[in-house]
Amino acid sequence: MGEVEQVLKEDGTPYKVGILIPSINNADELDIVLERLTKQTYPEFEIIIADSKSQDHTKEVALKHGATWIEDPSRNRADACNYALNMMDHDLVLFTDDDTIPPLDWVEKLVRWFSDPKVGAVGGPNFAPDEDPFGAKCADVAFCTKFMTAGTRYGAKPKGTLVPIHHNPGVNCAHRMANLREVNFFEPGCIGAEDVVLDAKIQRAGHKIFIDPNNIMPHRRRRPFKPYMKQMRNYGYTRMVANKRWPEISEKSHTVIGFFPWLIVGALLSVLGGLYLNEFSIWNQENILYYLMIHIPGGLAIFYICLAWLGAAIGTSPHRSIGTVFFAPLFVFLAHWAYGQGVNKAWAEIRRTGGKAGEGAQIDDRVRTA
């Protein structure tokens, strides 16, 4: 481990670097992450595993690779990270997940930017790894589709070497510990979108966030169909609840997608009703209302499919192919449907609790080892 020189602070001493990975019952994939991290080009850093009471061999995997293992009592990613951060004394904290495949120069490419004092945090894009199956690559293409992704930062790859940005996903980012302490780390009890909320807190404090478009983290996508849709449902649910507390992270598109399932149900009822009333003919124009009840939803569906194809074809996913682009409308539709369900669940939660942090629970979309 170590082929490059350490980045120095203003006082001439090296930054003390820590990599924090929250994990629960995912030892086999964590093993791959840690194996890659032990081969990094950057010479000195500590790996910390915040283990939320795993029932598998997570501890053994962590210790095998020389990582610091912390048994964490939390039940969400924000609190797990906070528990570990309160025990850490590093200058820089890098974050990733336990289902990534870190490039061997990942640490080097993140840490180098902190030689510039104006950089408060930096991150990079994430795409599905080449090892992912076809269905997961279809999900990646859907994540990175233009026009239809509700402002998600997954797959964001702007032009430039270091570009200002308002958010980096927690799977591929680094922060100054001083800034994290200043904002009291993650929002306690945040059940999801905790990385978005953290970046909002960092920016409220006056610090700047950047993205290095070339520092890509391969991140496994959920496979179709149940895990993929559960993930989308969780995104819609947790993001809308967080939006209630943090208005600056809210996008109008998040709310619009909440109406998507209702729109689909209405469109289906319109088509079925039109067919029934029009004697099951799609071309009979004797009653223009019945005709339009069939053809307006049908025309909108065709437009939706074509827009998804176009967005997928010009999106940022490296896994665009004839096959993955062809299936993009299906995966985009499933994402919108499930995300919309999550938004509706969030609206119910907000009516019940006001969106208070610590209420509710994430939807677990992972296949785990225990």
What would you call each of these model-derived segments?
Residues 187-250:
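Catalytic donor/gating beta->alpha subdomain of glycosyltransferases that bind UDP-sugars
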Residues 105-141, 216, 220:
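Conserved donor NDP-sugar-binding/catalytic core segment of glycosyltransferases
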Residues 93:
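Short aromatic/hydrophobic "clamp" motif used to bind/position activated sugar donors
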Residues 35-44:
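Short, acidic, metal-binding catalytic loop of nucleotide-sugar glycosyltransferases
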Residues 72-88, 159, 163:
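Glycine-rich, basic loop-to-helix element that forms the pyrophosphate-binding segment
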